[in-house]
Amino acid sequence: MDSRIYTIFNSYPDLVSSYQSGSTASLGLLVGHYIKQFGFTDDPVKVSRRMKELI
């Protein structure tokens, strides 16, 4: 899952930086891009939680 998350982070660096600046909505968009690219192979809640840990 982590490698997929990093793929999304690298594809949307602007969303990562806006999340780091306090925009919590950006995390939802990152999860949305993850689902769009990889489908529901992983639980979106787990993906979201893991993204928070990695950012």
Segments (PLM) and residue ranges:
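Charged, compositionally biased, marginally structured helical/coil segments
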Residues: 1-55
